Design a protein with these regions (language model features):
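Membrane-proximal helix-turn-helix segments that form the acceptor-binding/catalytic region
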Residues: 134-155, 256
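Donor nucleotide-sugar binding/catalytic pocket of nucleotide-sugar-dependent glycosyltransferases
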Residues: 150-199
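Conserved catalytic-core segment of nucleotide-activated headgroup transferases in glycan assembly
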Residues: 17, 193-248
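A charged, aromatic-enriched C-terminal amphipathic alpha-helix characteristic of glycosyltransferases
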Residues: 70-71, 307-364
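Short hydrophobic beta-strand element within catalytic cores of glycosyltransferases
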Residues: 283-286, 293
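Aromatic "clamp/platform" in nucleotide-sugar-dependent glycosyltransferases that forms part
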Residues: 265-267
Length: 364
């Protein structure tokens, strides 16, 4: 009997991370049961999850993250010492930027128990919007990331946009050889099965003249722009989820009722909000930058310079107002093709089919 360990990435029930972990566990367990395979799936928590609203007012501090990673290293040591790890077991990290991976690989080596490590790459010094890239000298970060990449057997990226960024860390001959090694890197996840389920549940929901702000109002998401547009165009219904504090079911109900979701992010993400919107038939009004250029069709994107800063927004204020009016008045025209694009995203993004193939050695 082999064990698939899923490593908890957050100590609290945040908007996405806990869903990703649950989706992976459920997907793997369903396949194991369906095929009658001899595997068990176990999530390793350092603190049991707490139920929170979709918006968390107290996100983890860097101290919390370091403490959690130290706790994970201790848990790994206990597992190996107590002979709870067997040859061929799998360890899945939702965030590949985790120094506990080094300790896990060390334990596997000294106890002579070969294991397989999987890691999802989300952020790193290769991403210029990540806090890991803010230092003037990035030498140690790049070396650490290449070492993590080498310690992980199967590295995963969620979009071609992120793959291109990750490649920038592997420019030397030796680094390129590592990056291009067979089966070293794959496209997968993070899995969004719960979004697919909610999309089916809310299919056919009546659309309101609503524009939704579907993220926390952090500085890098520029909620101030949404607030000013709300005051300028009161004829439309503007909803910020920070004001509603919905639970997950209510959150997806708001998405299903919206015609548009407004996005003005300055930091890179996996464009999950845009994916959620499209799956619910809501059009994401996203800037022509970051990985929105891959997830959101060009006809729905607005020029990046319009919201590169608050100053930029004021300079392009009139254009943005006319843009919003046009979108609202011609929703039926702009929504054409949204079901086809939703199918494209559903088929090619936010899935773990490739991970399943690797773990269970599925032959095509």
């Amino acid at each position: 009997m082999k064990t698939i360990f899923i490593i908890d990435s957050k100590t609290i029930d945040l908007k996405y991370i806990r869903n990703w972990q649950n989706n992976i566990q459920n997907t793997l367990e369903d396949y194991i049961q369906q095929k009658g395979l001899k595997y068990v799936v176990q999530t390793i928590y350092d603190i049991q999850p707490n139920p929170l609203t979709i918006i968390d007012d107290t996100p983890l501090t860097f101290k919390d993250i370091i403490n959690q990673q130290a706790s994970q290293s201790s848990r790994f040591a206990e597992l190996f010492y107590n002979k709870k790890v067997s040859q061929g077991d799998h360890f899945i990290f939702m965030d590949a930027w985790n120094p506990a991976i080094f300790q896990l690989r060390y334990l596997s080596t000294v106890y002579r128990v070969p294991i397989w490590i999987h890691g999802f790459w989300q952020m790193g010094s290769f991403n210029k919007t990540s806090y890991l890239s803010f230092a003037k000298n990035l030498i140690w970060q790049k070396h650490a990331e290449r070492a993590l990449f080498a310690a992980i057997n199967y590295n995963y990226y969620d979009s071609d946009y992120h793959l291109a960024m990750l490649k920038t860390n592997f420019k030397t001959i030796a680094a390129k050889k590592l990056f291009n090694a067979p089966n070293r890197i794959h496209k997968a996840g993070p899995p969004m099965e719960h979004v697919r389920d909610y999309a089916k549940q809310y299919k056919g929901t009546l659309k309101r003249n609503m524009i939704l702000f579907a993220d926390r109002g952090t500085v890098d998401r520029q909620l101030i722009i949404f607030r000013e547009l709300q005051r300028a165009l009161p004829q439309y219904e503007w909803v910020c989820i920070e004001d509603k504090m919905p639970n997950e079911t209510q959150y997806h109900g708001l998405l299903a009722s919206s015609k548009y979701v407004f996005i003005s992010d300055l930091i890179d993400s996996s464009s999950i909000t845009a994916f959620e919107a499209i799956m619910h038939g809501a059009i994401p009004l996203a800037p022509n930058r970051l990985n929105f250029t891959e997830i959101v069709p060009e006809k729905w994107r607005y020029p990046s310079e319009w919201t590169l800063s608050y100053v930029n927004y004021t300079e392009h204020y009139t254009q943005i107002i006319e843009y919003i009016k046009d979108k609202m008045e011609n929703y039926d025209t702009y929504k054409e093709g949204i079901e086809e694009w939703a199918l494209h995203l559903d088929t090619n993004y936010y899935r773990i089919d490739e991970m399943k193939r690797i773990i269970f050695d599925i032959q095509e």
